[in-house]
């Protein structure tokens, strides 16, 4: 009789274990998926998120070479650093200047008006050296990790 009791107990434990929800392991669709990281960068289920992409183009008021231009660009770089430090500016960089295309900003926002206000604080915009075009952009949420990676690969960060 004890053998039957232990056998029955073992069977119930086995069946019971199968009906209890298991602790969640890796996602079978993507074993590398990190839900904590995904939430931190604002990722949706596809690993994407919304941004505002800003294209900087040559404006109507070219500032000639000299102290005023130097000071304007010094302020431009300081403004980008401030916005990046605040977690608002995700990516920035220059274009080749062809067809008046001067640079690119990607902001961690989906609100064009809010982004317009942030961009208006840049001296190159305020002085008319450049004008900005605003576009909603849907891209990888991993872009939010670029700043931390940049600091690891830039020998002389900006």
Language model feature labels by segment:
Residues 23-158:
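Conserved, structured core segments of small domains
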């Amino acid at each position: 009789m004890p053998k039957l009791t232990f056998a029955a107990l073992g069977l119930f434990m086995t069946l019971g274990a199968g009906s209890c929800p298991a602790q969640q392991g890796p996602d079978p669709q993507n074993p590398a998926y990190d839900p904590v990281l995904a939430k931190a960068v604002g990722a949706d289920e596809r690993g994407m998120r919304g941004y505002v992409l800003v294209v900087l183009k040559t404006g109507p008021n070219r500032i000639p070479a000299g102290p005023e231009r130097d000071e304007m660009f010094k302020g431009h770089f300081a403004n980008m650093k401030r916005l990046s430090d605040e977690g608002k500016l995700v990516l920035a960089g220059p274009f080749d200047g062809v067809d008046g295309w001067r640079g690119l900003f990607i902001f961690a926002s989906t609100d064009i008006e809010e982004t317009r206000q942030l961009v208006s604080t840049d001296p190159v915009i305020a002085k008319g050296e450049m004008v900005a075009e605003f576009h909603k952009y849907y891209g990888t949420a991993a872009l939010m990790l670029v700043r931390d990676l940049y600091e690891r690969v830039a020998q002389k960060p900006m």
